[in-house]
From Swiss-Prot:
One of its GO terms (molecular function) is thiamine pyrophosphate binding. It holds the Pfam family Transket_pyr. Keywords: Isoprene biosynthesis, Magnesium, Metal-binding, Thiamine biosynthesis, Thiamine pyrophosphate, Transferase. Its EC number is 2.2.1.7. Catalyzes the acyloin condensation reaction between C atoms 2 and 3 of pyruvate and glyceraldehyde 3-phosphate to yield 1-deoxy-D-xylulose-5-phosphate (DXP). This is 1-deoxy-D-xylulose-5-phosphate synthase. The keyword Metal-binding applies. It catalyses: D-glyceraldehyde 3-phosphate + pyruvate + H(+) = 1-deoxy-D-xylulose 5-phosphate + CO2. Binds 1 Mg(2+) ion per subunit. Binds 1 thiamine pyrophosphate per subunit. Its cofactor is Mg(2+); thiamine diphosphate. Pathway: Metabolic intermediate biosynthesis; 1-deoxy-D-xylulose 5-phosphate biosynthesis; 1-deoxy-D-xylulose 5-phosphate from D-glyceraldehyde 3-phosphate and pyruvate: step 1/1. The lineage of its organism: Bacteria, Bacillati, Chloroflexota, Dehalococcoidia, Dehalococcoidales. It comes from Dehalococcoides mccartyi (strain ATCC BAA-2100 / JCM 16839 / KCTC 5957 / BAV1).
Length: 633
């Protein structure tokens, strides 16, 4: 790490630097980001794009007194470097180290934790109103990207902020050119005028002078109408001003001097929220990331790029299968929320551009949009990461299941996802989806199971959830033809005695590993692929309970409300609680921290060794568990 960056231990150190030193610091920060993210993995392109903004923010404002809120938080790496976490930066996204997002527990400079999009304006407005109620004096700044601002929650907050007239700053990081910047001499002139305090002074005095003249109010109203028409045709900020914001920009997001001028100007406004429109280049300063910002949005550890392929990932198998199904059935459509490539829909979107819909970061809308299409005879497949589907829970109940509409939910990244941590682990979906009446909930044991379950879902005529994990498949042979798997029918993979392991999804593969360990100890368990969580294969569960002494459930999901809980309830209702000993292996009632998938599975007893140890503990202590109990690692 270069010497200049080594001297920055807190934001106050930035204020001692000259403009040339600040520019050099920006170069050094980018070098550190590229080096560290290449080793540890993480979100690179977004962080590279806001280096100058981060420097300017910490020079103009006084963090942590002033509150700087980063939407999503994945672009906060430079912020971490400049706020006393430089020496810990090598631990970024490592188990026990710095989070890849903002985190209140990590630093007072992170006033609001993040991981999901579109929350920063609501949170910032809440802080600003709390400040006013307490009669305190500090600034609140929310930084949000042009993707995250498309989320409905952002617009709800913007509408509320304009109504409240609270002192509050929103910075729109426009790195996708979704809002075309004005260019040329006129734009530069207007920006210079807007950032000049004399402009507001002159405007206020002009209004006072004109309105005091005969017919002055009418003249002023006419003048304002002309101004509005001019702005609507020439300036990108008229929408914001209609919403009650003062608009500043567009600003060059890589010009520290211009950024500081805009921030200082925004800081001076007392009675209205301000929006600063900043234009940046995603991946700035790293040629590969600038050339392909989508690819370098998130990279894997020690590769400097995307994961090398040693087989097909679950997302790829899903995409290939859906492509095949859509080729055969023109009524099938795909819907995603700003994750076309991440969810394996890229090639499908190219092949069927009229039948693949990316609705932006709008999960609630995605679900009800799908419901609307389903009423007209289409079969929508909604493809969303598990952690983000939580946002559409009410719509799943109210708009899909209450009306029994045939919407398929392809839930990617189910289970432990790893280094992205607490905000991204997909550990609640089996619970919240299986509690909804009329919802089929399934989890394939491997990639072949996945393709057949997707085919089943599309042909079921029911609300159907298909949950699959992050990462590569199990390497099994993928059959060329698709077939239906009867809903609610699970399968015995291995016949054994005394002990039965009922595993779902990815846990089936780890249960197979456990069988090898247990066999060496003289235990030969029955293994069930519990692919359907709802409806349960009650007949099979009861049959196993009556023919085995021990029953173990395994799932990468919170135990509460998941597979284990449902089986416990079934056995209790059948009066079998005193006839079989039960252990439920899963996630305890806690949020799972960041760390690689293998480490976390080992920690929570979800790998083959952990499952085997739990079974040995259960079988080796006959006095334990006279009644069903939840057993957590």
């Amino acid at each position: 790490m270069s010497k200049l960056l080594d001297t920055i231990n807190s934001p106050s150190d930035l204020k001692k630097l000259s403009l040339d030193e600040l520019r050099e610091l920006a170069v050094q920060i980018r070098e550190e980001l590229v080096n560290r993210v290449t080793l540890n993995g993480g979100h690179l392109a977004s962080s590279l794009g806001v280096v100058e903004l981060t420097i300017a923010l910490h020079r103009v404002f006084e963090s942590p007194k002033d509150k700087i809120i980063w939407d999503v938080g994945h672009q906060s790496y430079a912020h971490k470097l400049l706020t006393g976490r430089r020496e810990q930066f090598a631990t970024l996204r490592q188990h026990g180290g710095l989070s890849g997002f903002t985190c209140r527990d990590e630093s007072p400079h992170d006033p609001f934790g993040a991981g999901h999009a579109s929350t920063s304006i609501s949170a910032g407005l809440g802080m600003a109103v709390a400040r006013d109620l307490a009669k305190e004096d500090y600034s609140v700044i929310s930084v949000i990207g042009d993707g995250a601002i498309s989320g409905g929650m952002s617009f709800e907050a913007i509408n509320n902020a304009g109504h409240l007239h609270t002192k509050f700053i929103v910075i729109l990081n426009d790195n996708g050119m979704a809002i075309s910047p004005s260019t040329g001499a006129l734009s530069k002139f207007l920006n210079n005028v807007r950032f000049d305090p004399r402009f507001e002074f002159a405007k206020r005095n002009a209004k006072q002078t004109i309105t005091n003249m005969p017919f002055g109010k009418a003249v002023w109203a006419f003048t304002k109408s002309i101004k509005r028409k001019f702005e609507k045709s020439m300036l990108p900020g008229s929408l914001w001003e209609e919403l009650g914001f003062i608009y500043l920009g567009p600003v060059d997001g890589h010009n520290i001097r211009e950024l500081e001028a805009a921030l200082k100007r925004a800081k001076d406004f007392e009675s209205k929220p301000v929006l600063i429109h900043m234009i940046t280049k995603k991946g700035k300063g790293y040629d590969d990331a600038e050339a392909d910002a989508v690819k370098y949005h998130g990279i894997s550890p020690k590769s400097g790029g995307l994961k090398s392929s040693h087989g097909l990932s679950y997302s790829q198998v899903f995409g290939q299968t859906l492509h095949k199904i859509m080729s055969q059935n023109p009524q099938v459509v795909a819907i995603t929320a700003a994750m076309t490539d991440g969810c394996g829909l890229g090639e499908i979107a190219a092949a069927f551009p009229d039948r693949v819909f990316d609705v932006g970061i709008c999960e609630q809308h995605a679900v009800t949009f799908a419901a609307g299409m389903a009423t007209q005879g289409y079969i929508p497949v909604v493809v969303i990461y598990s952690t983000f589907l939580q946002r559409g829970f009410d719509q799943i109940i109210h708009d899909v299941c209450l009306q029994k509409l045939p919407v398929v939910f392809a839930i990617d990244r189910g289970g432990i996802v790893g280094d992205d941590g607490k905000t991204h682990q997909g550990i609640f979906d089996l619970s919240f989806m299986s509690l909804i009446p009329d919802m089929v909930v399934s989890a394939p044991s491997d990639e072949n199971d996945l393709q057949h379950l997707l085919y089943t879902a599309v042909n079921s005529g029911k609300p159907f959830a298909l949950r699959y994990p992050r990462g590569f498949g199990e390497g099994v042979e993928i059959e060329s033809s698709l077939h239906n798997i009867p809903i609610g029918q699970n399968e015995i993979l291995v016949n054994g005695s005394d002990v039965a392991i009922l595993a779902t999804g990815k846990s089936v593969a780890f249960a197979r590993e456990a069988l090898e360990i247990l066999t060496e100890s003289g235990i030969k368990p029955t293994l069930v692929n519990n692919r359907y969580i709802s409806p349960l294969d009650s007949e099979l569960v009861l049959k196993i309970a009556q023919s085995h002494k021990y029953l173990v459930t395994v799932e990468e999901n919170v135990i509460s409300g998941g597979l284990g809980s449902r089986i416990n309830t079934l056995l209790a209702e059948a009066g079998l609680v005193n006839k079989i000993k039960i252990a439920n292996i899963g996630i305890p009632d806690k949020f799972v921290e960041h760390g690689n998938q293998s480490l976390l599975r080992a920690k929570y007893g979800l790998d083959g060794k952990g499952i085997a140890q739990r079974v040995l503990s259960l079988v080796g202590n006959p006095n334990e568990m006279k009644h069903p109990q939840i057993i957590c690692p």
